[in-house]
């Protein structure tokens, strides 16, 4: 099987566009043309209004060129991800393929096309808004919903039941529990038959979540470098 397939490789190599720039493409286009800020873009209004209009139009044109044949740019993200993950799962079926959910750092998301509109500038992205902390966050909900849609297609529509999932960079039991709840709502939880693993960033989550009925964390893995950086609050981008 595959010990660890990382979704971020598909995001950077095959997609290359910030997921929210795709999810909100139509709303961004309306803003660029008419100055109208849709409710979904309200959290980003200050950044949008500080953006040079010509640069924003150029950015949206680049997104359109990267998604030829798509009238719904959101579907481009889902297609790239489901075919990328599906290809790996199909190649190794029935052997298990462990897929780690997206774990780009904020500076890496900013490097994607449109990323500067949606990502904060963080002093230490290595231990900041990443991994599990994003998935249940309202500011990333639309992006993670697309990720889940693609993975659900792989498991349900493609019938690749060797798919397994890993939650990366989980810092607290509450964080892990919230992510499990989101995955379950999206049809990707342990109750739907998908093995779920935990990559913890501190010593707390695995021990406490493992003993909770219904949470369904199957296994845990320490990211040793990340654990050290988190505990020491050490700087670093890699």
Regions picked out by a protein language model, each given a short descriptive name:
Residues 1-238:
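Conserved alpha/beta-domain cores
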């Amino acid at each position: 099987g595959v010990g660890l397939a990382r979704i971020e490789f598909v995001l950077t190599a095959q997609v290359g566009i910030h997921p929210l720039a795709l999810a909100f493409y139509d709303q961004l286009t309306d803003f660029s043309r008419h100055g109208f800020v849709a409710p979904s873009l309200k959290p980003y209004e200050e950044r949008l209004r500080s953006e040079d209009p010509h640069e924003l139009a150029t950015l949206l044109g680049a997104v359109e060129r990267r998604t030829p044949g798509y009238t719904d740019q959101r579907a481009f993200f889902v297609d790239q991800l489901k075919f990328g993950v599906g290809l790996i799962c199909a190649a190794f079926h029935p052997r298990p393929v462990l897929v780690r959910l997206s774990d780009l750092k904020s500076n890496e998301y900013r490097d994607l096309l449109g990323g500067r509109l949606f990502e904060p500038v963080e002093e230490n992205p290595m231990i900041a808004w990443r991994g599990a902390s994003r998935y249940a966050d309202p500011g990333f909900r639309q992006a993670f919903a697309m990720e889940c849609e693609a993975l659900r297609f792989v498991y349900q529509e493609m019938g690749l039941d060797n798919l397994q999932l890993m939650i990366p960079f989980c810092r607290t039991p509450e964080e892990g529990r919230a992510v499990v709840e989101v995955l379950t709502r999206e049809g990707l939880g342990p109750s739907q038959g998908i093995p779920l693993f935990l990559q913890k960033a501190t010593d707390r989550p695995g021990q406490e979540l493992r003993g909770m009925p219904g949470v369904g964390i199957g296994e845990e893995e320490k990211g040793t470098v990340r654990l050290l950086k988190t505990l020491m609050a050490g700087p670093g981008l890699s």
